[in-house]
Amino acid sequence: MAKILVVDDERVLVKGITFNLKNEGYQVETGYDGEEAVELAREGNFDLIILDLMMPKIDGLQACMRIREFSNVPIIMLTARSEDTDKIIGFECGADDYITKPFNILELKARIRALL
Protein backbone atom coordinates (compact mmCIF):
# COMPACT_ATOMS: atom_id res chain seq x y z
CA MET A 1 0.00 0.00 0.00
CA ALA A 2 1.04 3.61 -0.49
CA LYS A 3 3.29 5.49 1.91
CA ILE A 4 1.93 8.88 3.03
CA LEU A 5 3.61 11.73 4.92
CA VAL A 6 1.28 13.84 7.10
CA VAL A 7 2.69 17.16 8.36
CA ASP A 8 0.70 19.58 10.53
CA ASP A 9 1.51 21.42 13.76
CA GLU A 10 -1.86 20.34 15.24
CA ARG A 11 -0.85 17.03 16.81
CA VAL A 12 -4.44 15.92 17.48
CA LEU A 13 -5.28 16.41 13.81
CA VAL A 14 -2.18 14.47 12.72
CA LYS A 15 -3.15 11.64 15.06
CA GLY A 16 -6.70 11.52 13.66
CA ILE A 17 -5.59 11.54 10.03
CA THR A 18 -2.94 8.91 10.76
CA PHE A 19 -5.48 6.65 12.47
CA ASN A 20 -7.89 6.88 9.54
CA LEU A 21 -5.23 6.33 6.88
CA LYS A 22 -3.70 3.35 8.68
CA ASN A 23 -7.18 1.82 8.89
CA GLU A 24 -7.30 2.11 5.08
CA GLY A 25 -4.03 0.18 4.88
CA TYR A 26 -1.68 3.09 4.14
CA GLN A 27 1.77 3.39 5.69
CA VAL A 28 1.95 6.75 7.45
CA GLU A 29 4.82 8.87 8.75
CA THR A 30 4.30 12.19 10.51
CA GLY A 31 5.94 15.56 11.03
CA TYR A 32 4.99 18.75 12.83
CA ASP A 33 6.69 21.70 11.09
CA GLY A 34 7.78 22.85 7.65
CA GLU A 35 11.47 22.06 8.03
CA GLU A 36 10.64 18.54 9.17
CA ALA A 37 8.36 18.16 6.14
CA VAL A 38 11.22 18.92 3.76
CA GLU A 39 13.69 16.67 5.61
CA LEU A 40 11.27 13.73 5.76
CA ALA A 41 10.25 14.19 2.12
CA ARG A 42 13.92 14.12 1.09
CA GLU A 43 14.70 11.02 3.18
CA GLY A 44 11.52 9.01 2.60
CA ASN A 45 10.12 7.52 -0.54
CA PHE A 46 6.56 8.82 -0.18
CA ASP A 47 3.70 8.29 -2.59
CA LEU A 48 1.81 11.36 -1.30
CA ILE A 49 2.27 14.22 1.18
CA ILE A 50 -0.44 15.99 3.19
CA LEU A 51 0.90 19.38 4.21
CA ASP A 52 -0.56 22.08 6.45
CA LEU A 53 -0.17 25.65 5.25
CA MET A 54 0.48 27.49 8.52
CA MET A 55 3.28 25.77 10.45
CA PRO A 56 6.29 26.80 12.55
CA LYS A 57 9.81 27.31 11.17
CA ILE A 58 8.79 27.47 7.50
CA ASP A 59 5.21 27.53 6.26
CA GLY A 60 3.59 24.94 4.04
CA LEU A 61 4.03 27.03 0.89
CA GLN A 62 7.80 27.30 1.40
CA ALA A 63 7.97 23.60 2.30
CA CYS A 64 6.01 22.72 -0.83
CA MET A 65 8.35 24.77 -3.05
CA ARG A 66 11.42 23.19 -1.46
CA ILE A 67 10.00 19.69 -1.91
CA ARG A 68 9.29 20.50 -5.57
CA GLU A 69 13.01 21.16 -6.05
CA PHE A 70 13.69 17.41 -5.72
CA SER A 71 10.37 15.57 -6.00
CA ASN A 72 7.14 15.40 -8.00
CA VAL A 73 5.30 13.52 -5.24
CA PRO A 74 1.60 14.53 -5.08
CA ILE A 75 1.02 17.14 -2.36
CA ILE A 76 -2.32 17.95 -0.75
CA MET A 77 -2.38 21.27 1.11
CA LEU A 78 -4.62 21.09 4.17
CA THR A 79 -5.43 24.47 5.70
CA ALA A 80 -7.94 26.74 7.39
CA ARG A 81 -7.26 29.43 4.78
CA SER A 82 -10.15 29.22 2.33
CA GLU A 83 -9.83 32.35 0.19
CA ASP A 84 -9.52 31.74 -3.54
CA THR A 85 -6.24 33.66 -3.62
CA ASP A 86 -4.80 31.30 -0.97
CA LYS A 87 -5.78 28.30 -3.08
CA ILE A 88 -4.25 29.80 -6.21
CA ILE A 89 -1.00 30.55 -4.38
CA GLY A 90 -0.97 26.97 -3.07
CA PHE A 91 -1.27 25.59 -6.60
CA GLU A 92 1.37 28.00 -7.89
CA CYS A 93 3.76 26.77 -5.18
CA GLY A 94 3.36 23.20 -6.42
CA ALA A 95 0.38 21.71 -4.58
CA ASP A 96 -1.69 19.15 -6.47
CA ASP A 97 -4.81 19.60 -4.35
CA TYR A 98 -6.08 21.97 -1.64
CA ILE A 99 -8.51 21.08 1.15
CA THR A 100 -9.83 23.57 3.68
CA LYS A 101 -10.38 22.88 7.38
CA PRO A 102 -12.71 21.76 8.75
CA PHE A 103 -12.81 18.88 6.30
CA ASN A 104 -14.56 15.55 5.91
CA ILE A 105 -12.17 12.60 6.32
CA LEU A 106 -14.09 10.72 3.61
CA GLU A 107 -13.37 13.55 1.17
CA LEU A 108 -9.69 13.53 2.13
CA LYS A 109 -9.49 9.78 1.55
CA ALA A 110 -11.25 10.16 -1.83
CA ARG A 111 -8.80 12.87 -2.89
CA ILE A 112 -5.87 10.69 -1.81
CA ARG A 113 -7.19 7.80 -3.91
CA ALA A 114 -7.62 10.14 -6.89
CA LEU A 115 -3.98 11.27 -6.70
CA LEU A 116 -2.43 7.84 -6.19
Feature locations, PLM:
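Charged docking surfaces used in two-component/phosphorelay signaling
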Residues: 15-23
